[in-house]
């Protein structure tokens, strides 16, 4: 038997640059080697690949070359060399290129060498560039192993490496001699990688070849099958052995390559035409720069293609048809098409995809011309707008990229020539008719051309082709013959509710798959997105089940996903509840002719009033058009019954079916005309329409005062003058329910008639649409200041004048297209409204925002929500985490203090409230918990308790989402009963909540304290067993049902800390958090957990410069030993590292490591004395720590404890005790929770690690896979080791999305690396017992060294004002500078006016001026010298702090430049605020019975009012010696801080007495007048107490100014000379009540000074020592 020649192969060859050098086939290794050896003679052949590819394919090449060289007649015989490099983008660098070149030089390769690049795009780009430059150019061949490389990077001769400035910025055009496409390699490719490559295949077809694109649209399943079916015995190498799937795959690849090859041949050097292959790449590359390496190139390009196609649509170049086809095609290959795709949205990096960030990245693009961005614009499928990239303005790109929009209020400009403001347009095809037409055409006999089909998320084709550039859909009907999909293939419908309901019955018609299909298919599964899984489908399923179709629910009862058996639609008599959705009725009607019963179907609608009858009539009318007539029965009197007879039969397709424009969509442009007083005509919708919503103009708009003219196929509306719409007293919209949202926004401003209220009825079904639309409209209209009330069948809207609508509202759209479009109508008359989730309109009118601007003529702008939500911090030291407003649950034993902790937590979270589940239970069931248990028993109580829990968190008792979650599921802290974990059902529900991203916190307290408390507590049912037994049973349940723990314990604060707000624990009391420190820890913990005030501090900038960060290593066996010195120890530190492995419990001195319980106590104790972030480290002995390497179980328990305690940073060792999967799971969990960041660390104590070696690169690559930060520690044996470290850091940080890196060398020689490290440098302190590592320095030492190196230049700071000779500010700031080792100096600059030469000279020193304080009398005058003000300074109208900020920007030439801006701020109000909240909690201050008093009306009074408004004090009294000034000041502060305060600002005639009309004595008093302006009452002035003594112009202070006695209260006197002012003296004299805390002016000065210090330096001021010195100095003065 002859042996087949394995070097022979049947190929598809593609020509490029006049040469057939691209060879495509299967199993080509022998052919490649033979071709190279025979046609490219050489002395040396070098194959370069990476570790991953080498394992799969290198051995075969080595064998083939050995065999080929042995047969070679060459003399001497050539050499074959191979070189394997690390995989990944890190190798594609200057250093990586140099290493390959060194290999070639070492092996004495010469110019005749031939290099083979075997691998993906990285290998091809890198090796190609090496070939282009080695010996000034050698021959090379591309052998791509990924589909992406086959169709893209290997073709065209582009070679390049990356640099820190961007990807592919250094390279050359260097054409390979051959490109060998071996499609068999794709069999080893993961499916996701195949999809990655298909993005480029779709791209080439989209820009060049519509025929190929059409093939791609319809044949995705076959292409996937080709790579998922392994070819045995080299099948495919020859035509005889090549399967049809292989032929399709190869022709698809060759066709894509052919497009690019043709373009390259015409434009090799990318002067114009070659730009076209960058379609999708301009935006795609920007996305990739943020998301790499998590998201693949093709996935980013896929999103980029859609966004660039939408950009073309926005510019009026591409129709929605093209966008829709492109979207569906990409989705067919499992590619994401939007930034909200789950693959993208689930990533932590997704929050970085801000519009400014993407636009900034897009600046660096080789297609650009100067500052002009160039993008390839699609004209239609298969053709581009220009034969090159087109210039596009940033504004247009911003609008496309933004996730939200704002409509600029204006009168429409219109699109009718000669008639300004008049609009004539058509809307997209009706969704309702499109969906029905698709089903009818697919089930019918023959061919049907559907025109004006809606191209949207909600319409999908069956068997189809496109005509007229996609304007016409050609459907080949199947006569009812359908087959169950292949196993594992589900029908995913997104949020397409209509499609889901129609297809439920359609799937019951499907026939089982042929026996030849193995494994056999059984049922059809239809599913959708999360929202789709909430929408009801139960009544339809019930009807089909009753008819014999055994449909199964795969998740929640009554919702998708469904499992539908084949051939199960029996027919005959069917009863259906139609009071929820008419779509259930239409689903059965459409399929009825194909039911099995010979007599067809008799459909009877039961269960109350039928909803949306017009849609049922529409279905029947369309069925008649397709050849089947439905009969609706009548009774003897001729009254129509809800019974329908449908005969068996076969639909017959009409040749052409024109789909009406969507009447629901038509309501929006018509409503724009109505609300703006303009004219609009909608074509293709009139009185003959099948759609009920076509009546909207006549039945609603005309009655609201519009002129309406309607023909059979056109509707014209002329609105009344602006503001003259009239409310209809009551309108029944049952025949046009979807249009009620449009009517609602018009009703909101229908203020033109006598009636101001408009009642809309007949819309009950709108509660179960994409969202509860009635509730949605009520909630969102409320944001505009519009009052509504809800009824069973609808709602009533109470109109307000347009001028009174609230501005700058952010509208949440609930992923509902109709909500978004309705509020876009209202936004045409109200400023600043932001429509979130702009893309939800894609369901029915994808181009709405473009049409609103281009056709109607109202400007629409993009809004970057991520940018709006970003925290603004002038110091820039906070890292953001996403804000999550889902409610936080508290669980734990009764008596742990859940209620108290919950109340404090809710009070500390802006906009949050507290709810006690037991109280909610009692209010709902109208009985106390104790009585309920007594009467009904524990089992019944647990059932009701579970129902309450489900209701509060917005889930069903089965853990599934519900359609209308309660308001308690957001922005609430919910305390649950101690026994909530007793039942499996409740535990499952809590775990389901956790799994969905909810927060459940276990509140703990020492069990002995709990026992003491419960032994005397009688309010709730007694336990029926010992408390300790209950605790032991529940403890593991609490742990499994919670994600975090919070310890409610009393920790004695160090000496000097304020012991405010003491609440002693004792019988009947559980408030253990009794100190200010305890309150602060509650605020920190829950603020961090919710993402409202994240406690991360590892990055940022100060004055536009990179801010270095440091952490102090605590090396105590018991951290409580550090508490007396904690303020000094933490000077300069941004975080504390808790070395868990070094902890030693004195009660277990022999234990090799601490217990979990001891560690929890240590963390809890540490939290009470410092709010600094904790770096939680369990260092193993292998990496220089104390934890035994063999105790894996205990190590994992300690790490888990850190996560549960919510530590901000968790140090996890690379190559540690954790397996790769465990590390990945841990990383995934922490990223999902968002409260803990992982520091992936590696410590080499051996000194063998070289910073320029391969080992450190591999460790770094491993660490960056799961670490939010990377820490690598080596050992310096010589000074040069530090230089190598810096080089490594520079290279590592140049990679896209490289995490922050901590890189240091141990030993004394390594100290320079600690000085130069920028992120989280570990520091020690002289007061610590030991250093954590050799070579550690203190923070102060590092600052001094940085100054000597010129990296921390000297700065000068000043105080502007007069008189200022005795100011305490120099002492305050200079003490802080000295303690931290900062080379700064603070001095006085006294002048008669602030705008003088001396001041101008100081502030104009751009290098040396660090900032300034401003005091009287210059706080207002100084504003003229500044560039901008902070919001608080603007509101207060005074500046006490000047901050120089350095900002980078791009100039007109595209160059980066830095400018200095002088920013004016006000820290007085912050100082006042801090002093108040140290004495009275924020929750108490917001209590409705709380009031505050401000004495004075000057600049400081403004700061005091601002502070009280910011705290939410509901009533603020203002008293001044000159009442007119107080009244002027009150007018300036209407609306309060940031215009969000809605309390009362009351100007008093006198202090005390009845406190005006309000009658509430103040709990907070702030005096801003000099001490000399007040006086204690005397015998002669007692009669005028509370008023101004005109003889002295002093305020006589009445005793009842301190009348408040119901709780803690505070008086702040801003004057600090004398120390004891008359106001403070009076407070002390009356202090027998014990509730008034006194604050001297110097304390406020200190607090505001601490804030100044941090804003200038980015460092926390060392408060305790600074305070001590200032008070000493004050005493001297």
UniProtKB/Swiss-Prot annotation:
| Reaction(s) catalysed by this chain's protein | 7-phospho-2-dehydro-3-deoxy-D-arabino-heptonate = 3-dehydroquinate + phosphate; 3-dehydroquinate = 3-dehydroshikimate + H2O; shikimate + NADP(+) = 3-dehydroshikimate + NADPH + H(+); shikimate + ATP = 3-phosphoshikimate + ADP + H(+)
Q: Where is this region: EPSP synthase?
A: 407-858
Give the record's pathway.
Answer: Metabolic intermediate biosynthesis; chorismate biosynthesis; chorismate from D-erythrose 4-phosphate and phosphoenolpyruvate: step 2/7; Metabolic intermediate biosynthesis; chorismate biosynthesis; chorismate from D-erythrose 4-phosphate and phosphoenolpyruvate: step 3/7; Metabolic intermediate biosynthesis; chorismate biosynthesis; chorismate from D-erythrose 4-phosphate and phosphoenolpyruvate: step 4/7; Metabolic intermediate biosynthesis; chorismate biosynthesis; chorismate from D-erythrose 4-phosphate and phosphoenolpyruvate: step 5/7
Q: Where do the record's region annotations for Shikimate dehydrogenase lie?
A: 1354-1677
The record's keywords, sorted A to Z, are: Amino-acid biosynthesis, Aromatic amino acid biosynthesis, ATP-binding, Cytoplasm, Kinase, Lyase, Metal-binding, Multifunctional enzyme, NADP, Nucleotide-binding, Oxidoreductase, Transferase, Zinc
Q: Which GO terms describe its cellular component?
A: cytoplasm
List, in alphabetical order, the GO biological process terms annotated in this UniProt record.
Answer: amino acid biosynthetic process; aromatic amino acid family biosynthetic process; chorismate biosynthetic process
Q: Write out the coiled-coil annotation as residue ranges.
A: none
- What cofactors does the UniProt entry give for this protein? Zn(2+)
Complex and partners: Homodimer.
State what this protein does: The AROM polypeptide catalyzes 5 consecutive enzymatic reactions in prechorismate polyaromatic amino acid biosynthesis.
List the protein's name: Pentafunctional AROM polypeptide
